[in-house]
């Protein structure tokens, strides 16, 4: 009898929860329409995988790419609409959040064609790979629009869990397993610290979880200058720091970059930074409005350490992927300058602009690494010597992307850094900008060192990997080359037409 009553109560409670969820989705679904497209794509992938054979592999790529493109289209149609808060305050849609969602979708759209040939050559499971990529993209998009502490914690965990699985996708590779274990342990520790910071913020604000309500709660409780807020600030900075991977929270980055499959590294190197940057700007700018001097100081320290350590250690690397890992640590130092400058001096606009260029530069470089790795089986920098003699197209593409990363005019990377540093200088961050300029010169050195190897490798320096290299035609149906061409063009041409890009970025501010 007791069991029967409990069973009825369980059914009633489950029905109420389902009806409430259906009601929320019915009246708020339009606010997450781009995310719903991705969810529908995920369901289609699962259905095709369960009901068909491996001959339908092209359909899997087509559905993944189409769902991403449709999601981008839905975002563009929603552009310039009035800011809205939905799902009982859990989610916010505005131009600022949507530009970051667009960047994440752009990353994923470029990464899928970059992965096609790699997956086929390495015989990795296709459906699971695409499912993890789309789910991670979904988590990143929800993080960009998150408006309360619970969503800000759950969304990056969705992204992180898929990242752990993707980084350990080659289970038989010892380096991949080691990198995944380190990534998982450090990710779990950072999430715990992040929740600890949220608990202090929740308690100090009188039990509020929405970002703007936390500010009002801190004013009502007079706790905005309390030691608890300082503890929350430090803990949240550490938690977000792991996602952004600035120094000294970068320990996982080189190992994961080196040990994970190259398309996975390409995906993680940009999407994690875009999503974490979107979250960082809103968390620091809204709940910690009264502690702006403190978080500015913390981020300045992180930016200086990242720019110096990232670029100096990159000089000594012998692996291309490991070199790009330390390079990305230096690059995030530049992005942090935009976060510190904030909304007042176009800091966020400069950060968004540079992030757009960084996506093209970084993914273009990784596309070259994927292509070279599939044809030679190595990513050692020495083995790139003399590549121009065998494959001028690949060598020139690599050189353009590396020069753009270094900030050589008239490429996009130069104008992105110029705008970012100019905004920092206007905001009075003279020391930080000076460090950025000096470390940019250092980065040019190790990028040029690689380009010199590519173009002028002597016969005695050319390794068997390049001697036996299979020449590729200039025009090819190779999907990796398609992504590479798009990224190379985006790394060069936008530098000439900066004004429209800056205008769009400025239009996204709060």
UniProtKB/Swiss-Prot annotation:
InterPro entries: NADH-Q_OxRdtase_suN/2 (IPR010096), ND/Mrp_TM (IPR001750), Ndh2_N (IPR045693)
Catalytic activity: a plastoquinone + NADH + (n+1) H(+)(in) = a plastoquinol + NAD(+) + n H(+)(out); a plastoquinone + NADPH + (n+1) H(+)(in) = a plastoquinol + NADP(+) + n H(+)(out)
EC id: 7.1.1.-
Topology term for the membrane: Multi-pass membrane protein
GO CC annotation, single: chloroplast thylakoid membrane
Signal peptide stretch: none
GO molecular function: NADH dehydrogenase (ubiquinone) activity; quinone binding
Transmembrane segments: 31-51, 57-77, 99-119, 124-144, 149-169, 183-203, 229-249, 295-315, 323-343, 354-374, 395-415, 418-438, 484-504
Compartment list: Plastid, Chloroplast thylakoid membrane
GO biological process terms, semicolon-separated: ATP synthesis coupled electron transport; photosynthesis, light reaction
Top enzyme class: translocase
Function noted in UniProt: NDH shuttles electrons from NAD(P)H:plastoquinone, via FMN and iron-sulfur (Fe-S) centers, to quinones in the photosynthetic chain and possibly in a chloroplast respiratory chain. The immediate electron acceptor for the enzyme in this species is believed to be plastoquinone. Couples the redox reaction to proton translocation, and thus conserves the redox energy in a proton gradient.
Assembly with partners or alone: NDH is composed of at least 16 different subunits, 5 of which are encoded in the nucleus.
Membership in a protein family: Belongs to the complex I subunit 2 family.
UniProt-listed PANTHER family: NADH DEHYDROGENASE
Stated name of the protein: NAD(P)H-quinone oxidoreductase subunit 2 A, chloroplastic
Organism: Nymphaea alba (White water-lily)
The organism's taxonomic lineage, starting at the top: Eukaryota, Viridiplantae, Streptophyta, Embryophyta, Tracheophyta
Designated gene of the protein: ndhB1
């Amino acid at each position: 009898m007791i069991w029967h009553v409990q069973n009825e109560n369980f059914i009633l409670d489950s029905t109420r929860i389902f009806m409430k969820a259906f009601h929320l989705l019915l009246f708020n679904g339009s606010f997450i329409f781009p995310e719903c497209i991705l969810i529908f794509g995920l369901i289609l992938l699962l259905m095709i995988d369960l009901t068909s054979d491996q001959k339908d592999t092209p359909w899997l790529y087509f559905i993944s790419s189409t769902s991403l493109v449709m999601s981008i289209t839905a975002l563009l149609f929603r552009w310039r609409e009035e800011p809205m808060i939905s799902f009982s305050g859990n989610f916010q849609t505005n131009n600022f959040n949507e530009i970051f969602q667009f960047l994440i979708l752009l990353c994923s759209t470029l990464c899928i064609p970059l992965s096609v040939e790699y997956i086929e050559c390495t015989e990795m499971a296709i459906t699971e790979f695409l499912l993890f990529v789309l789910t991670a993209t979904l988590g990143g998009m929800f993080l960009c629009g998150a408006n309360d502490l619970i969503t800000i914690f759950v969304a990056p965990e969705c992204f992180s869990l898929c990242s752990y699985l993707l980084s350990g996708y080659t289970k038989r590779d010892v380096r991949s397993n080691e990198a995944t274990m380190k990534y998982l342990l450090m990710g779990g520790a950072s999430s715990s610290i992040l929740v600890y910071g949220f608990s202090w913020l929740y308690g100090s604000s009188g039990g509020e979880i929405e970002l703007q309500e936390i500010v009002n709660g801190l004013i009502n409780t007079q706790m905005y200058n309390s030691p608890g807020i300082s503890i929350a600030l430090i803990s949240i900075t550490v938690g977000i720091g792991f996602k952004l991977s600035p120094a000294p929270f970068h320990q996982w980055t080189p190992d994961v970059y080196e040990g994970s499959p190259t398309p996975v590294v390409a995906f993680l190197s940009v999407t994690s930074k875009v999503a974490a940057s979107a979250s960082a700007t809103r968390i620091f700018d809204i709940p910690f409005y009264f502690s702006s001097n403190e978080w500015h100081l913390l981020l300045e320290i992180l930016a200086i350490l990242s720019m110096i350590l990232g670029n100096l250690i990159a000089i000594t690397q012998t692996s291309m992927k490991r070199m790009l890992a330390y390079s990305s640590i230096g690059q995030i130092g530049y992005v942090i300058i935009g976060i510190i400058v904030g909304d007042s001096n176009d800091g966020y606009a400069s950060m968004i602009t540079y992030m757009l260029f960084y996506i093209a530069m970084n993914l273009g470089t990784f596309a070259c690494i994927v292509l070279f790795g599939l044809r030679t089986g190595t990513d050692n920098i020495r083995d790139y010597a003399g590549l121009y003699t065998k494959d001028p197209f690949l060598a020139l593409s690599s050189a353009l992307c590396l020069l753009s990363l270094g900030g050589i005019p008239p490429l996009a990377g130069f104008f992105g850094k110029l705008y970012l540093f100019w905004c920092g200088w206007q905001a009075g961050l003279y020391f930080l900008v000076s460090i950025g300029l000096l470390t940019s010169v250092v980065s040019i050195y190790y990028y040029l060192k690689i380009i010199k190897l590519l173009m002028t490798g002597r016969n005695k320096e050319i390794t068997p990997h390049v001697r036996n290299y299979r020449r590729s035609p200039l025009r090819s149906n190779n999907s990796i080359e398609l992504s590479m061409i798009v990224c190379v063009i985006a790394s060069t041409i936008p530098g000439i037409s900066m004004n429209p890009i800056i205008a769009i970025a400025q239009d996204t501010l709060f």
